[in-house]
Amino acid sequence: MAEKQKAVAAQEKVAISKRDPWALKKWFSVYAPPYLGGVFLAEVPAAEAQKLVKRTLEVTLYDITKDISHLPIKLRFQIHRVDGLNASTRFKGLELTRDYLRSLIRRGTSKIMAITDVKTKDGWVMRVAVLGVTTHRVGTAQKSAIRKRFIEVVTKKAAEADIGQFLKEVLEGTLAADLFIAGKKIAPMRKVEVAKIKVLRYPPEEERVAVKEVAAEAAASS
């Protein structure tokens, strides 16, 4: 009898989902990681908690801080744990909007882009792109020297910080200020920004947590 009731219930769910795919979905509250304040980011729908894991969410820093100057900063988070109707995330990347980056480059200036892979002291491996703009045109040798200094500063800063400390320096503009100082020792700088960050590899404990949580969710639903 119990098996028959289960079969009927399953058929009813299928029928409902065919009529209205949203009928069986629940809304989950998604939060930023603790090292970014653990603030509420958004509500997202899903039929099952497991289907949220590894989903990427993009917001602006303005959505978190309500500071209008943070509108050009896009943040990407990846859901990696679900507890009931609450989902927690880990940082996945950062990028400045193209319009903002274009606004920094003026006629008669030089653009220097430095891209390097860094590793934080707690094991996060990331690719960081730094954009520097000089006040006037500079030669190839100066560009190379500035690029080298940018890479040295970013690599050193990352190696000395955990992910939370590193992102704090990026989002508060401290790292950009240090890069500006490093660059202007070679040529006058107009602006320096951390243009993009992409997580290439998470620390082992971050990966274990994600897999453990997926397994736990699957076990609970079986």
Curated annotation (Swiss-Prot):
Alphabetically sorted, this entry's keywords are: Ribonucleoprotein, Ribosomal protein
Q: Which InterPro entries match?
A: Ribosomal_eS1, Ribosomal_eS1_arc
Q: Which domain of life is it from?
A: Archaea
Q: Which Pfam families match?
A: Ribosomal_S3Ae
Swiss-Prot/TrEMBL GO biological process terms: translation
Signal: is it a keyword of this entry?
A: no
Q: What family is this protein classified in?
A: Belongs to the eukaryotic ribosomal protein eS1 family.
Q: Which NCBIfam families match?
A: PRK04057.1 (NF003142)
Q: Keyword Acetylation: yes or no?
A: no
Q: Name one GO cellular component term.
A: ribosome
Query: MF terms per GO, please?
Result: structural constituent of ribosome
- What is the name listed in the Swiss-Prot or TrEMBL entry for this protein? Small ribosomal subunit protein eS1
Q: List the disulfide bonds.
A: none
